[in-house]
Amino acid sequence: MKWLFHTLLCMASLKPQGAFNLDVDWAWVTALQPGAPAVLSSLLHQDPSNNQTCLLVARRSSNRNTAALYRCAISISPDEIACQPVEHICMPKGRYQGVTLVGNHNGVLVCIQVQARKFRSLNSELTGACSLLTPNLDLQAQAYFSDLEGFLDPGAHVDSGDYCRSKGGSTGEEKKSARRRRTVEEEDEEEDGTEIAIVLDGSGSIEPSDFQKAKNFISTMMRNFYEKCFECNFALVQYGAVIQTEFDLQESRDINASLAKVQSIVQVKEVTKTASAMQHVLDNIFIPSRGSRKKALKVMVVLTDGDIFGDPLNLTTVINSPKMQGVVRFAIGVGDAFKNNNTYRELKLIASDPKEAHTFKVTNYSALDGLLSKLQQHIVHMEGTVGDALQYQLAQTGFSAQILDKGQVLLGTVGAFNWSGGALLYSTQNGRGCFLNQTAKEDSRTVQYSYLGYSLAVLHKAHGVSYVAGAPRHKLRGAVFELRKEDREEDAFVRRIEGEQMGSYFGSVLCPVDIDMDGTTDFLLVAAPFYHIRGEEGRVYVYQVPEQDASFSLAHTLSGHPGLTNSRFGFAMAAVGDINQDKFTDVAIGAPLEGFGAGDGASYGSVYIYNGHSGGLYDSPSQQIRASSVASGLHYFGMSVSGGLDFNGDGLADITVGSRDSAVVLRSRPVVDLTVSMTFTPDALPMVFIGKMDVKLCFEVDSSGVASEPGLREMFLNFTVDVDVTKQRQRLQCEDSSGCQSCLRKWNGGSFLCEHFWLISTEELCEEDCFSNITIKVTYEFQTSGGRRDYPNPTLDHYKEPSAIFQLPYEKDCKNKVFCIAEIQLTTNISQQELVVGVTKEVTMNISLTNSGEDSYMTNMALNYPRNLQFKKIQKPVSPDVQCDDPKPVASVLVMNCKIGHPILKRSSVNVSVTWQLEESVFPNRTADITVTISNSNEKSLARETRSLQFRHAFIAVLSRPSVMYMNTSQSPSDHKEFFFNVHGENLFGAVFQLQICVPIKLQDFQIVRVKNLTKTQDHTECTQSQEPACGSDPVQHVKEWHSVVCAITSNKENVTVAAEISVGHTKQLLRDVSELPILGEISFNKSLYEGLNAENHRTKITVIFLKEEETRSLPLIIGSSIGGLLVLVVIIAILFKCGFFKRKYQQLNLESTRRAQLKADSLLQD
């Protein structure tokens, strides 16, 4: 029977592979020959009628005769792409600034930004024209938003102060009659620009300095007009002795050159031929050969300093000539000459009607600058403004766009209301729209120049749909606003996310992503393409879309290549479908300036691919596609991206990338999983192995689609087999070593590829380990022969490691020939669990290991113990053999590994005793563990025990002996005392202990002590003072309040002195009860951390004894007492005499004296 091992590939995050999983070797590039579209953006679109996908390319049109949209498809040759213009696109008259191209299952929307002049007016505007196409690219609706207010609900009020509109208004026919809206056909009838001819008086009556001021005035006027009037052209005619054209309308189109010519004009002087100069303009300026257009509005500005002089023509004749019809004339008179009625009447004759609006008079040339704003207001007056505030004139409707349901579109109006911006919710069915901008809560000063509507996106939430709009210049940092379409009194965008860096253009690109493809938006990507560190590298913020009104939460950020600056990463973004076939949406992000400046003609720009997974988007890209790897001559590659549809019909999602001059389509490569199996014959390695082991290695393709089958036929599989990879000395090896290393096999078709090879034993087969499995690792990769191929080559999954592990077991002397079941019992005990550093010398652990089951192979014991335990000795049995290595540091512990009964531990017991010395140094932790771990090569036979140790540190601290102090209260009622406490000892391990000094300050109800000062000798000693009702360990009689001093000490010695003032003058009654005052000293510490070795010396006392003397009695008392005493003495003597006391005694004494004399005489006689 064969033993078959199957393995699944391990999930892992690897470094990006260059070709996962878009095929850069085969790309469709739009042709660069004349007439091909110069790309602004590109889009993949599918026609639902035939399910065919085409490439739509938007180009910058120079005029109305060139198409703005092209449809491209694969031509007859499979590697070429052919493009045809798409009809029906609205192309108004004007200068085209850009094209917005979006699409979905409802159709395709093309919006062109147009720079033109308003109908029958000098006012210029920057607006949009949009065409909505059906899914098969037929025209569905179109609108030219030249007069945006005409498209709005007439009941919708827009407040130009706070830039928000209120909801309400009329419906039905009332709406249709609101304002007249112009069609593109009507646009053809409008005039072609504005032509302004300046007629400058250069006669001799003008001083050169004044003439220079006139030239400066003309230069300033032209600059201001160029900024306000998009299609204004100028001509300048000077008159005097001669009449000459300084520059005409055609030459003024070069703005810088024409401004330079103004300053280089030389004054011609002499006569004042004003009428002839005006006729010269009619004959030589407002003609086609000089750049004049037939339908252009024509303006003549005459600047003069007085009467006409020396002119052969009559002014009235010139004014009434047919050529003057339709020319708007402004007359500016400079100087005092116009105080004369005739001269002023002549000036008014030059001007058009009404004379008051077209005639200007100043006293001198220095005052001309004051006319600029008034003249500009008359010539290029911006209708619909409040002051200088613009409303819809520069709205650029359609700058961004989204197609909604029910014939509605959402259009960005980035330039509305002084570029505060907004959006137009427009219905193509009834031609009406609602203007949406920021909430009234926003400060009107901060919303100006926000560019709201620069980008738009639609978020699909569980409770409905909401719209988000980017405002990249909001408060200079950028912001994202959201509009929730619900039944509310007001529809307005509310700020939801703010940018973090000034100038980063945060919010300029928005990309909603439905990761799991369930129809609900999961993430919103917000780009800041100008985010700068060293240059404008760019950054993309990934926000999780909240439910209902919750806040957007930042998941993470994405960035391009860290070593490249000015890449503008995030300039374009798109969700491109499931290009790696894992059922999660992927995202493409463009960095169009990456690699810019590498060399003349070199391609630059990149696109990064970020794959989705169940939790969102991966932080790192799976592929970076550089322009140089796709085709030569690609510039700004990555300025637009789109995808998610199958372009070439292979069933896989493809993407399109726009560059400056062409669009590129890249096809996806099929992603395949390989299931690797390995079969051994025999299925286990015998104990005594002689011969060969037959091995069959098979790779099976596990792919959900058939797209990989054609490409597999041209693939090669390169695999390597490594035998016994976990051992330094191999026990088996391939018989043919070349057959196991970098084997290249062609995949000839089908889903299987199998290979046979032989394993043979080495000389070291059973020298040490004949029991543990032999591990065999197989690594593999696909290779191609290179070149372009009709079918995309498959690729392995980027997120799965291309390797497999197999185990070849040895036969075992057990019931199961492959696995032995050992039963390991482990018991331990330790000599003591509480260790005192500085006191404890040794600690011993006894270890008992018993195997009561089958054989245990390669049994190992690992001892993990703290570093302050130094290994001393080990006591081990003779049999089975125990061999231990020297301890080695691993992280914060020491590890000692021991081999127990190698190679086989039979049914037996092992008793081991390990002794450590406790290091006399500070141990930082309160506790530590000694862990014993038993392991072997068997399956499921792990044993472990842990013993916890508790550590304390020893110290010696001795307080000075008790002492006595005296206070003579009879001499002085108060005294100054200093109480000295000396601490000395040995503190090797930095133990922290507290010295508490207790000074009684209130006895009974009398305040007798006041502490004046506290001193110490060590800087690191910290002392605190407080008044407490109790102090010390034992109570003291009569004391009601204490002054407590607590000092935290870590040194070997310390002297603490407390100075106090003792006052007992007013407490005579207290002194009768109290004869002494105790001052206490006591050492305390945390007994769970430290061990004090001499507790008997941790207390002391200083006793203050009060000395008292008897008081001297007064003189009357002494005299009275003396007299009384004498009288008592006299009475006593009289009583004794009366009783014969003195008489009897005298007689007895005489008798005794006579007797002694008689005896003495007798004694002498005898001698």
UniProtKB/Swiss-Prot annotation:
Extracellular-side stretches of the chain, per the record, are: 20-1114
* Sequence segments annotated as region (Disordered): 163-191
Which residues of the sequence carry a binding annotation for Ca(2+) 2? 578, 580, 582, 586
- For the keyword Disulfide bond, the answer is yes
Which residues participate in Ca(2+) 3 binding?
A: 646, 648, 650, 654
Q: Taking every annotated instance into account, which residue ranges of this chain make up the domain VWFA?
A: 193-382
Signal peptide range equals: 1-19
Q: Which GO terms describe its biological process?
A: cell adhesion; integrin-mediated signaling pathway
A Pfam family of the record is: Integrin_A_Ig_2
Q: Where in the cell is it found?
A: Membrane
- What keywords are assigned to this protein? Calcium, Cell adhesion, Cleavage on pair of basic residues, Disulfide bond, Glycoprotein, Integrin, Magnesium, Membrane, Metal-binding, Receptor, Repeat, Signal, Transmembrane, Transmembrane helix
Chain ranges on the Cytoplasmic side, renumbered to this chain: 1138-1167
Describe where the FG-GAP repeats fall, as residue ranges on this chain: 27-81, 84-142, 383-435, 438-491, 492-552, 555-619, 623-683
PANTHER family from the UniProt entry:
INTEGRIN ALPHA, INTEGRIN ALPHA-E
Q: How does it assemble?
A: Heterodimer of an alpha and a beta subunit. The alpha subunit is composed of a heavy and a light chains linked by a disulfide bond. Alpha-E associates with beta-7.
Q: What is this protein called?
A: Integrin alpha-E
Q: Organism, per UniProt?
A: Mus musculus
Q: Which gene name belongs to this protein? A: Itgae
